[in-house]
Amino acid sequence: MAATVGDGSGTEEACRNMESKEEFVKVRKKDLERLTTEVMQIRDFLPRILNGELLESFQKLKMVEKNLERKEQELEQLIMDREHFKARLETAQADSGREKKEKLALRQQLNEAKQQLLQQAEYCTQMGAVTCTLLWGVSSSEEVVKTILGGDKALKFFNITGQTMESFVKSLDGDVKEVDSDENQFVFALAGIVTNVAAIACGREFLVNSSRVLLDTMLQLLGDLKPGQCTKLKVLMLMSLYNVSINSKGLKYITESPGFIPLLWWLLSDPDAEVCLHTLRLIQSVVLEPDVFSKVASELQSSLPLQRILAMSKSRNSHLQSAAQELLEDLRALDCNV
């Protein structure tokens, strides 16, 4: 037993010696001092280095946080703007849809109004054509003409007549309207009424004194219409001017109109025999009135389309031939070098 205990005590002591060896390291004093110095330096410098880096990192973090906060605010503002513009877009789309519906409704109303206006215009044209055709027929009576001129609407009627004929000619624009259309008949009837009124002395006097605008309009329209265009209207206007020329004041007024003589030559170039016939008769009125002829003789003789008139004097149309021959005889009588 004693031997056994003694062995155990020796083992424990050996262990303690081993533990003591592990706790200590044998270092030279010089190395220890150097190590101690370095440790002291590290202990002094490390906080400074760490503090500087930490401060820099902290500042960067602050900047990042500020930037992040600004970006968040900008994002929030963008979201608000988006919602605002989205609301405006929805409102605009709603307004646009409503306006489209309103425009569609207005367009339909406009189309309906145009259709109604067209129907009314057609009705008025038909009514005007019928009424004026009837009036044209009865205006060949002197009593009827006196009744027309005796009313307070005569001047207005002739003003409207001139405006209607002018509008009609402007609307042609090279197009050929149907000869039998209500519009044509309406305008022709108006021109026919003027012709019949001018065929009566009191009618000529009224037109010369009170309705010179109508005379100016007819002269203008005769120049506006192209050769061969709307010949019936040309003939009626020429007949009206011829009737007016029977009145001395009427003839004087017509011949003093700017461009009157060139207009006559222009009308003589028309291919329609009726237009040429009534132009010759109007020229003859000028030639047979000494006071008027003396004022236009020089211009008339210098520009007279003699060859055209000579050709008409040989026309197969007996009326045109006769009128041309009579004019040539009148010109020879006046020593016009014909």
Curated annotation (Swiss-Prot):
The keyword Iron-sulfur does not apply. One of its GO terms (biological process) is spermatogenesis. Sumoylated by UBE2I in response to MEKK1-mediated stimuli. This is Heat shock factor 2-binding protein. Residues 18-55 are annotated as: Interaction with BRME1. Keywords: Chromosome, Coiled coil, Cytoplasm, Ubl conjugation. The keyword Ubl conjugation applies. Meiotic recombination factor component of recombination bridges involved in meiotic double-strand break repair. Modulates the localization of recombinases DMC1:RAD51 to meiotic double-strand break (DSB) sites through the interaction with BRCA2 and its recruitment during meiotic recombination. Indispensable for the DSB repair, homologous synapsis, and crossover formation that are needed for progression past metaphase I, is essential for spermatogenesis and male fertility. Required for proper recombinase recruitment in female meiosis. It comes from the Eukaryota. Interacts (via C-terminus) with BNC1. Associates with HSF2. The interaction seems to occur between the trimerization domain of HSF2 and the N-terminal hydrophilic region of HSF2BP. Interacts (via N-terminus) with BRME1. Interacts with BRCA2 and BRME1; the interactions are direct and allow the formation of a ternary complex. The complex BRME1:HSF2BP:BRCA2 interacts with SPATA22, MEIOB and RAD51. Expressed in testis and, to a lesser extent, in lung and muscle. One of its GO terms (cellular component) is cytosol. InterPro entries: ARM-like (IPR011989), ARM-type_fold (IPR016024), HSF2BP (IPR039584). It comes from Mus musculus (Mouse). Disulfide bonds: none annotated. The lineage of its organism: Eukaryota, Metazoa, Chordata, Craniata, Vertebrata. Residues 1-20 are annotated as: Disordered.
